Amino acid sequence: MRSYTLLALAGPLAVSAASGSGHSTRYWDCCKPSCSWSGKAAVNAPALTCDKNDNPISNTNAVNGCEGGGSAYACTNYSPWAVNDELAYGFAATKISGGSEASWCCACYALTFTTGPVKGKKMIVQSTNTGGDLGDNHFDLMMPGGGVGIFDGCTSEFGKALGGAQYGGISSRSECDSYPELLKDGCHWRFDWFENADNPDFTFEQVQCPKALLDISGCKRDDDSSFPAFKGDTSASKPQPSSSAKKTTSAAAAAQPQKTKDSAPVVQKSSTKPAAQPEPTKPADKPQTDKPVATKPAATKPAQPVNKPKTTQKVRGTKTRGSCPAKTDATAKASVVPAYYQCGGSKSAYPNGNLACATGSKCVKQNEYYSQCVPN
């Protein structure tokens, strides 16, 4: 059920923030997201997409890679990652009661999980896709290894099918090892921070989009500042989308046509997606029912904390950010830091030298600027 909270604005207009309770599923179909087409909502630019080599595409009319001969796919850095033990960031395909793409494309929502092993944890997601086969207040979370669902753009993007069931994806963390390098981190996230939760329920509220998500998608709603800022802890270990995020920021600005802030929501393109499926799935392709294809350069993506594997069935897709093992200085004098906190560093940056990780975790390089303690 969805409710609305009226927020007073400085101007004459008021914007209602969506909130309520909902259900999640998972997917990763590699398809171009629906919100990557122009004219879906009043935004500065459509969500970014990438070619099969994970390079940002500037042509918002590029054909969906899930269609024959298509060249636009979801960028691998649309993979989820842990901000700290209790908060994660990511992207999703959505269908919100009483809304439409004009109201949810590129909008951000703070989810608080209410069931399963992640009960009590929070995740902020940006909606980059629309689920034509989803029910009301249904969020199809993008996570590599979650299953491709109705559409499969991964086979054409990577030259081979990704492992796992069409709905639900893989069932063990070790299966992530067979995935393309750029998808492994996001795949591991599912079994680590997300604890292999199987389609947990949640409560949600619309919030301002975190810069880290905007840097990846390159898409910001004109009314984003009208919504409340997330009040939870976002500091702990902030593995912001590494180079990929930075790359996307500039890529987003240069690659996508900008819209004026005053532009009203544009009419959405007619959808050409197939019908619903056996499990909550994700829409795939063109306007209205395309899959979220976050456009962000692949290169480097915020690495996800690696935790303990779990088994589960999910709904869709697969992709992820790449990660590089960080070097740890065995002779570092710095005091040890807990899992998911920043580690490594040099004497010039830290008075005590290299920051070592606590027993049971190792220092993993997320990008050229940041390393994080990840459980063994």
From Swiss-Prot:
Residues 19-308 are annotated as: Catalytic. The active site is at 29 (nucleophile), 140 (proton donor). The keyword Zinc does not apply. Its EC number is 3.2.1.4. Residues 1-18 form the signal peptide. It is an enzyme of class 3 (hydrolase). Residues 229-332 are annotated as: Disordered. This is Putative endoglucanase type K.
